[in-house]
Curated annotation (Swiss-Prot):
Belongs to the inorganic carbon transporter (TC 9.A.2) DabA family. This is Probable inorganic carbon transporter subunit DabA. It is a peripheral membrane protein. Keywords: Cell membrane, Membrane, Metal-binding, Transport, Zinc. Zn(2+) binds at residues 398, 400, 580, 595. The lineage of its organism: Bacteria, Bacillati, Bacillota, Bacilli, Bacillales. The keyword Cell membrane applies. The gene is dabA. It comes from Bacillus cereus (strain ATCC 10987 / NRS 248). It is found in: Cell membrane. One of its GO terms (molecular function) is zinc ion binding. HAMAP family: DabA. Its cofactor is Zn(2+).
Length: 874
């Protein structure tokens, strides 16, 4: 499958003499080509994304074949991963055999079925063909003699970048040289870490800034600079001219642009993200490609003309014959006795049953085994939903998989009911913390904030706090200024050495005590005052979005969230909204451990705002008129679940009623035990803890404070399912921290709107998280970010390996691997399980084209559990 077949494009029929039409066509081409890469968020707000989000109109299998062809990237689990999973009992042989039977039934071939099955069974062992066999002179001679056999449609072609076809006199590929230059310019332009000397003319855009400097670049030869001396002033003109001089035809342009974007998907992804953030940079993708392809022309021009592009990929006959000899138990003598037609049939069959098909069957068997094990687990624990015990407190947690063990242990230790909901609690807000002039979106990255909420304090207390904070920040600012200044940077080691040396020693040998001391000291010094929020609507023309909510909006958001989790009656005296956050030291990926539903930030702010709204008399009065009656003695509070240490920190506790105080005290009394159990379960999964842990909570805190710790927690590794239904469906199930859990009561959703919004919002976030972990596991060299210990944080944006690599877009090795040879994360596509009648699922698939496409094309799996408890795979 060719590159351009991935993305549909309109035929270009306009004359080249029409400049305006050329520009419009170029815009369309770049827009279509951009779908082969995913936007990459800065690492400080590490937002989960999956690298194939723009390709979901194609099937997973098609994209896998395409990536294998053009980038040699394999997105199926490796043979070692599959063998390991089978040894652990994660793959049932029965599902593999049924998958093979279905595949054979779908194929047309003219060899005996028994012979084909025997070949496939051996090939499915995923053993490599012996190198001695592949290099056998006898076999290669045989292949030469039968190379005339017509393999029909088995040949394919791919479009190569011209620079990738040429090597310089030193033997270095010109595409590597081109990448080196592009990385340099991207770092200069995108720098977000406040470099003392910024790129000149940066405010005019990437292309113009590059155009102004390129003829002075000493890294280019005199002839290369000469090519670019009188280059067009605008990006579109430059891109058009470069493609023309390279000899790229109209029909190949989009495929050629795609190839350049895939060459450095990290930097290109960051460029794409930036282009979506402001009107001023909306042309950034065109500018990036103009710079890249213009530089390619300058580098390759001495070697032009060259016959490129569509390179016919000849089918290698040797491995196909070798596969029949090794797996099909055919000797060379038997092969020679066959007719040309028989040989051709065997070659065609072996070609079709290639490595991707074999791994696809294994992956599907792995996924089916997981689905069946989950079905059995749920079925064995099903209970009636109408006979609820007395509940003292209700706690709403984020759907994050790390909440599942914590909720399970909490429910065992008291009369508590827990709910699952996206951790932004349905509030589309941008938050501005006390003393900050900036705000950050605290909601899933697929949404845009509609309200700004500011943290407020008493004017006098705020003034004192601001002064203390200024002193605190001035220390960091002074240190940074001295470090970047030519003269003071030489003095800095003498001034800061003793203090930083002491910190290094103490942080290394007593990390838990020192970390706790520093955090408490800073908290004491800052003395943050009690705060409130700007909840009431304020019209401010200086702000892009309104501050606060109208009364109707307050009621609407509370109603919407309560209905989404099915909490509209039988309120407990205490309702706790639990956001979540992580705690780690010296960790560039700290945001990846925070709340994905809050855009890579902690969820406590949203939890506190929502709880405050629920306690407002006017909100309760309006809800009561609609039939949602919250008892007067029911109080909403907010807490933050710290996932690294499995503790609950109270962040908003108003005056409690007597019943609510009793519930609060009960939670406080059981929380140490909950933390102990949850930490023990979690820590035993880490590579360093195979023996019994004496004090799990103490060890968890050490991990959080140790600045040499490369794996403070597993994050969302091993996530595999997203269960949408009532808590009773999974309450007594040990889901091993692998399931996103979202409450849903189909009986309160006659229209299906609630289910649709869960799928469109939290469902999409869960899918992105799942496929990011999947991609980082199966193709770490392309979609992961390598080893944490050798990474370099660059430009305040992300990480690189060394100082001249692609901007690494995925998760580090430590987030998905148990050891060099063993994975921890199981690379399975997300299984979405919905507890609802069949007609609800049918309606969802009928109305939601995007979701239907994801299911049909294999980007997610779908199952349902009807009111009678019957499981159905869709």
């Amino acid at each position: 499958m060719g590159i351009s077949s991935i993305v549909t494009k309109e035929t270009l029929k306009k004359k080249e003499t029409n400049i305006e039409v050329q520009e419009n066509n170029m815009n369309d081409l770049v827009k279509s080509a951009s779908r082969v890469i995913a936007p990459l968020w800065p690492i400080a707000t590490f937002a989960a994304h999956h690298p194939w989000m723009g390709l979901e109109k194609q099937s997973f299998e098609q994209v896998a074949d395409w990536l294998k062809e053009i980038r040699n990237v394999d997105i199926y689990p490796s043979a070692s991963m599959i063998h390991s999973a089978k040894a652990k009992g994660e793959i049932e042989e029965l599902f593999l055999q049924s998958g093979l039977s279905r595949w054979l039934d779908s194929q047309s071939f003219h060899i005996p079925r028994e012979k084909a099955e025997r070949f496939c069974q051996e090939a499915l062992k995923l053993e490599r063909l012996p190198s001695s066999l592949l290099s056998s002179p006898e076999l290669n001679k045989l292949a030469e003699e039968i190379s005339y056999i017509n393999t029909g449609g088995m040949k394919d072609s791919s479009l190569q970048l011209i620079s990738s076809l040429i090597e310089d006199q030193k033997g270095e590929n010109l595409s590597d040289i081109l990448n080196y230059h592009i990385i340099k310019w991207c770092k200069l332009y995108l720098d977000d870490s406040g470099a003392s000397w910024t790129m000149p003319n940066r405010e005019k855009g990437l292309y113009r800034a590059w155009h102004h400097l390129i003829t002075f670049d000493p890294a280019l030869s005199k002839n290369e600079r000469k090519v670019l001396k009188d280059w067009p002033q605008d990006a579109q003109g430059a891109l058009t001219k470069a493609l023309s001089e390279l000899g790229i035809s109209e029909s190949n342009k989009q495929a050629y642009l795609e190839g350049h974007l895939l060459a450095l998907p990290g930097w290109a992804g960051m460029i794409r993200w930036r282009s979506q953030q402001s009107i001023q940079e909306q042309e950034l993708m065109i500018e990036y490609l103009a710079v890249r392809i213009s530089m390619e022309l300058a580098i390759v021009k001495p070697y032009l003309p060259i016959k490129n592009q569509k390179i016919e990929k000849k089918v290698e006959v040797v491995p196909l014959i070798a596969s029949w000899i090794y797996w099909g138990d055919i000797s060379i003598e038997e092969w020679l006795q066959m007719s040309a037609t028989e040989q051709s049939e065997l070659l065609a069959f072996a070609y079709r049953f290639d490595e991707n098909i074999r791994k696809k069957l294994w992956l599907e068997a792995w996924e089916q085994t997981h689905a069946e094990q989950l079905r059995e687990k749920i079925a064995s624990k099903q209970r009636a939903t109408n006979d609820k015990k007395h509940v003292l407190a209700q706690l709403a947690f984020c759907i994050d998989v790390r909440s599942e063990p914590f909720r399970r242990h909490l429910e065992k230790l008291g009369p508590f009911e827990t709910f699952g909901i996206a951790g932004f609690f349905g509030l589309p807000i941008a938050t501005s913390e006390l003393g900050s002039n900036d705000s950050y979106p605290s909601l899933p990255v697929i949404l845009k904030p509609k309200h700004q909420i500011k943290e407020l304090a008493d004017e006098k207390e705020f003034k004192n706090y601001k002064q203390r904070k200024k002193i605190d920040s001035s220390v960091s600012y002074t240190f940074k200024t001295m470090k970047q200044n030519v003269l003071t940077s030489m003095l800095l080691p003498e001034v800061s050495g003793p203090l930083l040396g002491l910190q290094m020693v103490t942080r290394s040998f007593v990390p838990r005590r020192v970390g706790s001391f520093i955090r408490n000291l800073r908290k004491t010094m800052l003395q943050k005052p009690d705060t409130t929020f700007s909840l009431n609507h304020v019209h401010d023309t200086k702000c892009e979005i309104p501050i606060g909510f109208t009364k109707e909006e307050k009621v609407n958001y509370v109603r919407q969230t309560l209905k989404m989790v099915g909490l509209t009656e039988k309120f407990a005296p205490l309702v706790v909204m639990c956001g979540h956050s992580s705690q780690s030291t010296n960790n560039p990926y700290a945001a990846a451990l925070e709340c994905g539903a809050c855009g890579g930030a902690a969820g406590g702010f949203n939890a506190r705002v929502f709880a405050t709204l629920c306690n407002l008399p006017e909100v309760r009065e309006a809800l009561s008129a609609e039939g949602i009656k919250i008892p007067e003695d029911t109080i909403f509070v907010a807490a933050e679940h710290k996932t690294t240490v499995d503790e609950l920190e109270w962040i908003y506790v108003p005056k409690l009623s007597e019943a609510a105080q009793e519930a609060f005290d009960r939670i406080e009394s059981v929380m140490p035990n909950v933390s102990q159990h949850a930490n023990r379960e979690r820590l035993t999964q880490l590579p360093n803890f195979k023996t019994k842990i004496k004090n799990p909570s103490k060890e968890a805190h050490r991990f959080a404070e140790d600045w040499s710790e490369i794996r403070p927690e597993w994050g969302l590794a091993r996530n595999a399912s997203f269960i949408i239904g009532q808590r009773e469906l999974t309450q007594d199930c040990d889901l091993e921290g692998r399931a996103f859990l979202h409450n849903y009561d189909w009986k309160q959703d006659e229209s299906g709107d609630i289910l649709a919004s869960i799928i469109a919002g939290p469902g999409t976030v869960a899918q992105w998280i799942n496929l990011q972990y999947y991609a980082s596991t199966v193709a770490p060299h392309y979609y992961g970010s390598g080893n944490k210990t050798t990474q370099t944080v660059t430009s305040g944006l992300g990480v690189m390996q060394g100082n001249a690599s692609d901007l690494l877009s995925g998760l580090p090795w430590q987030s998905v691997m148990q050891s060099d040879n063993e994975t921890y994360h199981s690379p399975l596509r997300l299984l979405i399980v919905i507890q609802a009648p069949t007609k609800y699922i049918e309606r969802l698939l009928k109305n939601d084209f995007t979701f239907r496409e994801k299911v049909k094309n294999g980007w997610v799996r779908l199952a349902s559990v009807d009111p009678e408890g019957q499981w159905k795979n869709w």
